[in-house]
Amino acid sequence: MPSLPAHLDRSLYPFEGKVCEVGGHRMHYLDEGEGDPVVLVHGNPTWSWMYRRLVTELAPHHRVIAVDHIGCGLSDKPDDDAYPYTLERRISDLETLLERIGATERISWVVHDWGGAIGLGAASRRPERARRIVVMNTSAFGLPDKTRFPPILWWFRHTPLGGMLIRGLNLFCRGTMVIGCRRSRIPAAVRAGYLAPYRSWESRRAILRFVEDIPTNRHHRSWRTLLEVEARL
C-alpha cells in the first residue's frame, strides 16, 4: 500500500488510501463515506491531495472517490515502455477503476485541468450514470488544427531544456503553485504535500507527458480521442 512520506503533516490528509490494479499498474485512490458517489478527478501537476478538503466536507453525506492518475500522486509511475501516457488510456483507466470498485450509478463528477478531458471522457461514454458535473478550469474540446501553444508550454514541450526543468528541477509543479495562488502564499505544509510525490526525475515523468499529450494538430495521437469526447458532450 503506498503511503504518505513521513515528513508530511498527516492531519492535512487523514485518509487511508486504497489501491486497485488497473492495466498491470497500481492506481491509488481515496474512498471515503457512503451514498451516491462523487468522483474527483485531478489534472497536471497535482494529485488527490488537491481535493483533501472536499473529501472531508463531502464524505459525511456522499461516497467520495479521489483518484491519482497513473504516474501521479501515490499511484505507480511506470516507464514509457510500460505505459502509454495518453488521454485514451487515462479515460480507460478511470472507467476500469470505477467499475471495479462499484461506483457506477448516480455519479457526481468534479473535474479540473487535464482531469476535465479524462473525467468528461469517462462520463460521456456512460451518460446515464452521471447525476451532475462540476467543471473547473478545463477543456474537453478539440482545438483548431495547428493551434499555437502558449509560449511557456511550447518551450516546456519542444525544447530539451524545458524537459530538463520539468523533470530535473520540478519547475512545473513549483511554478504552478506560484501562478495559481495569487491572494496569499500557499502554506509550506500544503506546498510540501503537492510536491511530495514528485521528488525525483523518474517520478516527474507524467508531468512532462501530460504537457506532451496536449493535441494541437490532427496528427497528434490524442487528437481523435479529444474530438470524440467533444462530440459526446
Enumerate the language-model features and the residues they cover.
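A short, Lys/Arg-enriched amphipathic alpha-helix followed by its capping loop at the start of a domain
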Residues: R53-H62, R100
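The serine-hydrolase catalytic nucleophile loop
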Residues: N44-V55
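Flexible "cap/lid" subdomain of the alpha/beta-hydrolase fold that forms the substrate-access gate
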Residues: P2-V19, H25-M27, P37, M50, ...
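Intrinsically disordered/low-complexity terminal segments and short unstructured peptides
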Residues: M1-P2, P45
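N-terminal cap/lid subdomain of alpha/beta-hydrolase-fold enzymes
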Residues: T56, V67-I70
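Short beta-strand element of the alpha/beta-hydrolase
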Residues: D36-H42
